[in-house]
C-alpha cells in the first residue's frame, strides 16, 4: 500500500499485533487459492467506534459488518478475488440478517474506491481517525433487500 504511493496505511499500521488481535477476536478472514492466502480482511460486527462520528449520514443505523485491513497479495491482484471476498461478507450478512456492510478507505486509494463503487457501495461521508490516519471516505452497502409489507 505504502509502496504504491497510497496513504491508506502507515509504517506502523497495520502491525503484527493488529492481525493477532483480529485472529484472537475471531475477526480474521482469508480467501485462499490452492492453499495459499490470497486476500485478508478483518470482518467485525459493529466493530468501528469512529463510525458513530461520521461527517455525513449512513444508510442504516442498525447492525453492520465492517471490513478493515483489507488486502490482496500482489501475486493475486487483478483476478477478482477482492470482489469475491466482499461478496462472501455480503453472504454472511444475508445469513445472519445483518443489514449492511460498512468500509472506509483513504481518498487516494482509487482501486478500493472503484471496487466498492462497482459493488453497490455508496459514499456516505467521511470518518476521521486523527493523527497519521486522518480522514477516510465512509462507504456502506445494503445487504438485505427490503420487502413490501402486506
Where are these regions (language model features)?
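Conserved GNAT-fold acetyl-CoA-binding loop/helix
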Residues: 1-21
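Conserved catalytic-core motifs of GNAT/GCN5-like acyltransferases
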Residues: 104-105, 117-137
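Residue-level recognition of the GNAT/N-acetyltransferase active site
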Residues: 68, 73, 104-106
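Conserved acyl-donor/pantetheine-binding loop and adjacent beta-alpha core of acyl/acetyltransferases
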Residues: 42-69, 77
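Conserved GNAT acetyl-CoA-binding A-motif
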Residues: 86, 93-105
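Conserved beta-hairpin
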Residues: 27-44
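Conserved acetyl-CoA-binding loop-helix of GNAT-fold acetyltransferases
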Residues: 72, 78-91, 114-118
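Conserved beta-strand-loop-alpha-helix junction that forms the acyl-donor binding cleft
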Residues: 77, 103-113, 130
Amino acid at each position: 500500500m505504502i509502496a504504491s504511493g497510497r496513504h491508506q496505511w502507515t509504517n506502523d499500521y497495520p502491525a503484527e499485533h493488529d492481525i493477532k488481535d483480529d485472529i484472537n477476536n475471531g475477526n480474521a478472514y482469508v480467501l485462499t487459492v490452492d492453499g495459499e492466502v490470497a486476500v485478508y480482511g478483518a470482518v467485525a460486527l459493529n466493530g468501528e467506534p469512529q463510525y458513530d462520528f461520521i461527517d455525513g449520514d449512513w444508510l442504516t443505523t442498525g447492525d453492520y459488518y465492517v471490513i478493515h485491513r483489507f488486502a490482496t497479495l500482489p501475486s493475486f491482484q487483478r483476478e477478482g478475488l477482492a470482489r469475491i471476498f466482499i461478496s462472501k461478507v455480503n453472504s454472511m450478512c444475508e445469513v445472519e440478517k445483518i443489514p449492511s456492510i460498512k468500509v472506509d478507505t483513504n481518498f487516494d486509494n482509487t482501486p478500493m474506491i472503484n471496487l466498492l463503487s462497482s459493488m453497490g457501495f455508496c459514499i456516505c461521508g467521511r470518518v476521521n481517525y486523527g493523527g497519521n490516519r486522518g480522514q477516510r471516505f465512509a462507504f456502506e452497502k445494503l445487504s438485505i433487500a427490503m420487502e413490501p409489507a402486506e
